[in-house]
């Protein structure tokens, strides 16, 4: 709510405090202010430059936003620029806005793409956007007595997720994986499913990823009709590190308004949280801080905690966050993914080995976890089914070395049955996505959690032992399985 704000940016500044640039080193700018008028940490400063080359249409000046990061003494602050500093000179006049960067909030954000400062990037020439309220991006997390204590499952309709790594309503979910295993596709699919099946509001933060992917995402969401229910904030890999560091806060501020003022459940997507950490490392180096382990910033845990603590459920309303996490060189001991682990309620690990088998989503069923995979939250039937599936897959994994040496025919009957069921389970954990329809030609499917549990219980019980492995590939629920098996019998004359 409004009382949760740290420092509200004033609507009008009659006499903004002016300072001057004393030092420029890349995107780090030192600014001197009059004695007694030093801006607070995280205040936004602006400097306007005339005749600096290319401007936005209709603009005669280039405005640069600076964010105060350090007080150096002698009435001087050290700032980080959020835009390129080409053309900036010593002695240029800098104005203190009197508060942190503030961004538009509310219904005006839906269907629009914003930069870190809240400027609309996809506004049509004839479109008039009236911003009635702005919130600062630096805010305190909800007080402890405002937090929601109830825990419940968030149904996605994706079999492998609902069964083995159920998501928490108002929780934080990490999508782990190396390059090219499907993190962004899974996020796009979740945006589609939230809009279609839950009618919720989504906020997307594109942090340090490819601009092409951002354009593709906007186009696909527009085609699917979900763009009007989504606010998007982008700070892609060609942006300044200061911008990439603050984009998640801009998106989170918009999500907090929907939760706290409009009393809505919100899904916040961050792609990619590793780039947030990476940007923090770059800013830390620019500011001259001593690096910590593997060259990361010494305040890595503090920066991550400040972001993650704001992503939570208040009484009756929630922000559920899905965060894609790039794992450098597939090394899970790297400080960036390791620091993120501590804040997550569920982890979905995407495996290159499973992707190489052509099974998508390439979720590793044995490595992915969820804190609510517990009878108290999901029920005994769900818990027992998930454990049976994991036990079969684990036993199959243990038998692979033996099979490679002597072949599957030399196994005992019980192990043969386990391997055959495991292969069917692996195929059945795959699923067609709505966002991939135009690439695969196969329609996407939504499988309710109850149907998922029933189907996998039947497989574990041996009901489908006579059904070939191929029948389990590329389908949705039980009805799809039985229809495909019936069609295969007709085709092969069985």
From Swiss-Prot:
Q: Which domain of life is it from?
A: Bacteria
Of the GO CC terms on this record, one is:
proton-transporting ATP synthase complex
Which CDD domains does this UniProt record tie to the protein?
ATP-synt_F1_beta_C, ATP-synt_F1_beta_N, F1-ATPase_beta_CD
Q: Which EC numbers characterise this protein's activity in its record?
A: 7.1.2.2
Q: How is the subunit organization of this protein annotated in UniProt?
A: F-type ATPases have 2 components, CF(1) - the catalytic core - and CF(0) - the membrane proton channel. CF(1) has five subunits: alpha(3), beta(3), gamma(1), delta(1), epsilon(1). CF(0) has three main subunits: a(1), b(2) and c(9-12). The alpha and beta chains form an alternating ring which encloses part of the gamma chain. CF(1) is attached to CF(0) by a central stalk formed by the gamma and epsilon chains, while a peripheral stalk is formed by the delta and b chains.
Function, please? Answer: Produces ATP from ADP in the presence of a proton gradient across the membrane. The catalytic sites are hosted primarily by the beta subunits.
Q: What is this protein called?
A: ATP synthase subunit beta
Q: Which organism is it from?
A: Bifidobacterium adolescentis (strain ATCC 15703 / DSM 20083 / NCTC 11814 / E194a)
- Lineage of the native species? Bacteria, Bacillati, Actinomycetota, Actinomycetes, Bifidobacteriales
